[in-house]
């Protein structure tokens, strides 16, 4: 008799339906591209995840960088205890916190009785932004992922100024021609103005002859590859043979070049992607 009652209890419990949480974008309809003034999302019922009634609040961040080290750019919304029909937005992002492009993902941090659940979207494009990232950690993270916060155009030396974060990987001085920046990676940093009267700075070796350099050091090599476009691969070459010459950026067509992200190869670590159907909040 006791065994029969226990089986009945287990059978009844198996039919209890808990309303679980699922997040999706409302506008735009997909997570691929959105305007900076139109980001909305909603809670929906799901057959997996954490029961909706257990969630006390969720904070939505828009981030750049990587999932392992997210760099929050802004808090979009702090949700109270949600319901299956609750919706938030549209939200506007400050235009100046970063550049436009496929650089951003959403981080939803939900608090419930058992702890905290972190969920992340895939990268998506935010249109209409006009700012820049000052934090070099964001640059480094995006470069490691194959996603870069600047889409260079082949406009000569100004391209190099835009590609690399200020203050890293280069030493600048002004050449004899007023206003022209040069880079001198193989000698000490000179004064702000470099003229013929500057005699206290000596190059580490002969730098005016390309043949001398290649004899002892070999030809210049590629120092960095920047994935800045879905159709072109930009490669930066440093010309160490002359401190007064600029690096060269080569654009190579790369049909079908696709970005990489931190969880494409490690799906079990990332939790759900917001907007996936029939999935709820998963533990990260």
From Swiss-Prot:
Tagged with keyword Nucleus: no
InterPro entries: Kre9/Knh1 (IPR045328), Kre9/Knh1-like_N (IPR018466), Kre9/Knh1_C (IPR008659)
Subcellular location: Membrane
Regions that span the bilayer: 88-108, 144-164, 212-232
Primary location class: membrane
Keyword check for Membrane: yes
UniProt keyword list: Membrane, Signal, Transmembrane, Transmembrane helix
PANTHER family in UniProt: CELL WALL SYNTHESIS PROTEIN KNH1-RELATED (PTHR28154:SF1)
Record protein name field: Uncharacterized protein C11C11.05
Organism: Schizosaccharomyces pombe (strain 972 / ATCC 24843)
């Amino acid at each position: 008799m006791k065994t029969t009652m226990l089986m009945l209890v287990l059978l009844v419990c198996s039919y209890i339906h808990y309303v679980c949480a699922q997040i999706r974008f409302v506008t735009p309809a997909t997570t691929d591209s959105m305007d900076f003034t139109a980001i909305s999302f909603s809670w929906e019922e799901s057959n997996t995840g954490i029961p909706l009634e257990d969630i006390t609040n969720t904070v939505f961040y828009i981030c750049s960088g990587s999932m392992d080290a997210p760099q929050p750019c802004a808090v979009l919304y702090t949700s109270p205890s949600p319901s299956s029909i609750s919706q938030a937005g549209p939200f506007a992002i400050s235009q100046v916190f970063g550049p436009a492009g496929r650089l951003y993902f959403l981080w939803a941090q939900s608090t419930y009785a058992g702890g905290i659940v972190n969920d992340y979207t895939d990268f998506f494009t935010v249109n209409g932004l006009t700012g820049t990232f000052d934090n070099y950690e964001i640059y480094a993270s995006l470069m490691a992922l194959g996603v870069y916060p600047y889409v260079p155009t082949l406009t000569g030396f100004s391209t190099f100024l835009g590609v690399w974060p200020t203050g890293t990987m280069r030493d600048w001085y002004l050449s004899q021609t007023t206003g022209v920046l040069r880079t001198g990676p193989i000698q000490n940093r000179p004064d702000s103005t470099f003229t013929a009267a500057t005699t206290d700075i000596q190059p580490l070796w002969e730098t005016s002859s390309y043949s001398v350099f290649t004899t002892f050091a070999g030809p210049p090599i590629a120092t960095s590859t920047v994935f800045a476009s879905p159709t072109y691969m930009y490669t930066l070459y440093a010309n160490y043979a002359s401190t007064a010459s600029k690096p060269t950026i080569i654009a190579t067509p790369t049909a079908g070049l696709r970005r990489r992200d931190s969880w494409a190869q490690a799906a079990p670590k990332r939790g759900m992607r917001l907007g996936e159907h029939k999935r709820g909040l998963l533990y990260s």
